A protein has these predicted regions:
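Adenosine-cofactor binding site in Rossmann-like domains, unifying the SAM/SAH pocket
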Residues: 18-38
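N-terminal Rossmann NAD(P)H-binding glycine-rich loop of SDR-like oxidoreductase domains
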Residues: 1-18
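Active-site loop of classical SDR/Rossmann-like NAD(P)-dependent oxidoreductases
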Residues: 8, 208-209, 232-254, 265
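NAD(P)-dependent short-chain dehydrogenase/reductase
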Residues: 131-180
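Mid/C-terminal beta-alpha module of Rossmann-like enzyme folds, strongest
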Residues: 191-241, 274
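C-terminal amphipathic/interface module of NAD(P)-dependent oxidoreductases
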Residues: 244-280
Length: 280
C-alpha cells in the first residue's frame, strides 16, 4: 500500500509498484488518529508512507507549522501505531532537513539530528515515531526531482524566459531522481535487508544549487554566466521569511551500497532528464 500516492514521490512509487493499493489524502488522512485506527490494514504486509507536508517556507508560518506537524509528526505516529498493531512493514520517507548541515563530510544515518526549520523539526519527530516500530525502514533522501514542480523544471522555465537568476551557491548536495529513489525502495521491500534507516540519493560529486542551475541553463542553450551565485546569508537577508537550509546536504551512501542498492550518478541522470524535458 502506498500512502500519499498523489505527491512528488508517491506518484513515482505508484508507477514502480503497479500491484500496490494507492491512497491519496482523500482516501486516508494520516493526521487523523481515528481514521487511521479504523482503516482496514490487515490485508497489507508493507505500507510505503510518502505522505508529507513539504512546503518548507510555508511551514514557518503558524498555519503551515500546524499542517506540517499534523502530517509529518502526528501522521507518522498514527501509521507507526497501526504498524505495531497490524504487524506490517512501514517504510517512511525522510529528508536531509533533519540535519543542520553545519558539519563537513557526508552525513551518516546515525548522525544526531539538529534541524534548522519547522519542516525539519516535524520530520525528525516523525522519524522518531517510526523508529519505535519493530519492522521499519526510514529512507532519508535529498533534493528530489520528481513529478510536478521541481528545481530543474523551474530553472528550465527561467532559461527559456531569458532570465538571469541569482542562485544560492554555498549549499552542497546531490540531486535524487524519483525513479532511482523508487528503485531503491523496491530493493528494500523485496530483499528485506536489516530494518532501520538508509540514506538514499543519487551518487556522484556533490554540487551547489547554482552549479546545477548552470548545467540546466547550458542544456537550454544559455551560458554559464547567465546564472549568478550568492551565499545563503545574503539570500536570507533579502528574504527573511524563508526557512534556513542546511549548507551540507551530502548524505553518506555506504550503508545503502552495502545492501546492494544501485546508486546512479546524478549528472548523467540530469542529462537524461533534461533531454526528455527539452523534447516535450
Amino acid at each position: 500500500m502506498i500512502v500519499g500516492a498523489a505527491g512528488r514521490v508517491g506518484s513515482s512509487l505508484a508507477r514502480s509498484f503497479p500491484e500496490a493499493t494507492c491512497l491519496k489524502r482523500g482516501d486516508l488522512d494520516v493526521g487523523d488518529p481515528c481514521t487511521v485506527a479504523r482503516f482496514g490494514w490487515s490485508r497489507d504486509d508493507v505500507v510505503l508512507n510518502a505522505a508529507g507536508y513539504t512546503d518548507v517556507d510555508a511551514a514557518q508560518s503558524r498555519a503551515g507549522s500546524a499542517a506540517a506537524w499534523r502530517t509529518n509528526h502526528v501522521g507518522a505516529a498514527n501509521l507507526a501505531q497501526a504498524a505495531i498493531r497490524h504487524r506490517f512493514v512501514l517504510l517512511h520517507l525522510s529528508t536531509d532537513y533533519v540535519f543542520s548541515g553545519r558539519t563537513t563530510g557526508a552525513i551518516s544515518e546515525d548522525a544526531p539530528v539538529d534541524p534548522l526549520n519547522v519542516y525539519g523539526e516535524s520530520k525528525a519527530a516523525g522519524d522518531s515515531e517510526v523508529a519505535r516500530t519493530p519492522r521499519h525502514y526510514i529512507v532519508r533522501t535529498s533534493w528530489v526531482v520528481g513529478e510536478g514542480e521541481n528545481f530543474v523544471r523551474r530553472m528550465l522555465r527561467l532559461a527559456h524566459a531569458g532570465q538571469r537568476p541569482t542562485i544560492v551557491d554555498d549549499q552542497f548536495g546531490r540531486l535524487t531522481f524519483a525513479d532511482d529513489l523508487c528503485a531503491a525502495i523496491r530493493h528494500l521491500v523485496v530483499h528485506r535487508p536489516a530494518f532501520g534507516t538508509y540514506n538514499v540519493t543519487n551518487d556522484g560529486t556533490p554540487a551547489t544549487w547554482a552549479a546545477i542551475a548552470r548545467k540546466v541553463f547550458i542544456a537550454a542553450g544559455r551560458r554559464d554566466e547567465d546564472v549568478s551565485g550568492r551565499t545563503t546569508r545574503e539570500f536570507l537577508a533579502e528574504f527573511p521569511k524563508k526557512a534556513e537550509r542546511p549548507l551540507n546536504s551530502v548524505l553518506d551512501l555506504g550503508k545503502a551500497r552495502g545492501v546492494g542498492i544501485e546508486l546512479h550518478d546524478w549528472e548523467p541522470r540530469l542529462k537524461e532528464y533534461l533531454e526528455r524535458e527539452l523534447t516535450r
